[in-house]
Amino acid sequence: MSWSTFMHNERPHVHRHAPEFSFSKISFDDRDLPRKLKDTKQRPKAYYAYDVTSQCVVGFAYNRNKNVDLVVDCFRDMFRLMERNGWNCPAQVEVENHLMSQWKDSFLKAGTLFPFVRFCAPLNSQEKFAEPLNGAKKRSVEHKNHLGIGRFYAKNEKYRAESKKISDEYNDTYEEKQYYTWEQLIQEDMNDVHEFNHSLHPNQKKYPGMTRWQVLESNMNPTLQPVDKAILYRFIGEHVETSIKRNSYCRVNYTDLWLSSPEVLDRLAPNNNQVDAYYLPDEDGNMGDVYIYQNGVLLDKLSNVGTFNTAEAEQTEADKLIMTNQNKLISQFDAMTKKEAIAPVVVMKAETAQKIAKATAKPVQVETEEPDMNTLIAQFSDYKGRGVADT
C-alpha cells in the first residue's frame, strides 16, 4: 500500500465544518475540464476559487497548460468580482504548494494581503475544501448538461465514460467519441459556473430557499478589511516601466496620469525619475487605479486628471473642472519650488569684509551658580510626593 493510499484510506483525519460568514475562507484548486479539444486532443486546464461558506465559485480562469498564468488570471478574476460588488478582502485563502509557493514571502505571506494563509500539504487533496466542491459542480451540473462526462473506471454507470482504444506502437492511445473547440468548452464551463452558483445551497435546513449566490451576498463577514490594491497590483497586476515627466505625470499605456502631489518627487532616488507602474485591467482592458514604485518602494497612486478643450467657446463645465485641477497641481509645484529655493547670492561690501577680518574673538565668560542643597531636597521631596499621588 502506498503512502498516499494509506493516508487517504486508513490514517485518521480531522473533522471540520464550514464557517458562518462568506469570505472568511476562500479555497483554490485546479482541475482538467472533462472533455477534450479538437486541435490538441488534450483537456483544458481550469482554476477555481470557492467561497467555503456559500460554495460559490468567486474566481475562475482557463489555460491550455497548468502554469503561473492560470493562477494569476484566477486571482485577477476574483478581485475584479470583488471590485464590481464592493466587497472587502477575504480573511483567509487556502492554496496548494505547487504553483503558489513562489509567493510565500510576498503577497501570500500571512498579514501582507490576507490575514490568514494556509498552504495545503502536497498529495493531501482531502485537505482542500475546493476538491469536493469540484466534484459537486461536476455531479450536479456538468453531468446534466453535457455528454461524455465521466471516468472510464467510475463505479456508477451514469458517471462512466467510454473511449475507443487505438492500436498503435504505444498501445495506450484512446480516442474520444467527440472533440470540441476551445471556445465551446470554455463558454460552456462558464455557463456551468453560473448555473452552479445560482442553484440552491445544499444546506437547505440552514439556508431555506436560498441559492449559493444569495448565501454569499447575505452572509458577508462584517470584520473584513478593504483590499490593499497597492500590494495586490504589484504582484498580480500588469507592469509598465515608465518615468516621471515634467515633474508632474507618468505615461502609462499612452495615457498621461498625474502625481497626487509634487511632494512625491522628494521620495525619488537622487537623479532617478524611472518608476514601475502597476495596475489591474478590468474585463474591457481599462486600467483603473495605477500605483508607481521605485526600487520596490511605493511612491504614489496616479490619477487620470484628463484633458480640457483649449477653445473657450466650446468648454463645458467638465473642461473647466479639469483645467482647475491641473492648475492646482501646477500651483502646488510652484509653491514647493519657491519654498525650497536657494537664497540668492549677494556681494558683501568691502568695508564690511575688512571689519570682519580685523575683528578678534573674545572668550565668553559663563557664570555658573552653585545649587542650594536645601532647594534640591525640597524639589526632590515634592517630585516624590507627586509620584505617589499619581499612583
Name every feature range the model reports, one short phrase each.
Residues M1-S22, A110-F116, P122, E131, ...:
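Intrinsically disordered terminal and processing segments
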Residues D29-P34, Y50-S54, R64-K66, N97-L99, ...:
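Short, flexible loop/turn elements at secondary-structure junctions
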Residues Q55-C56, V297:
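Residue-level signal for well-ordered, solvent-exposed loop/turn and beta-edge residues enriched
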Residues Y180-E340:
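C-terminal, beta-rich DNA-binding module of retroviral/retroelements integrases
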Residues L299-T391:
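Extended, compositionally biased alpha-helical segments that mediate assembly or anchoring
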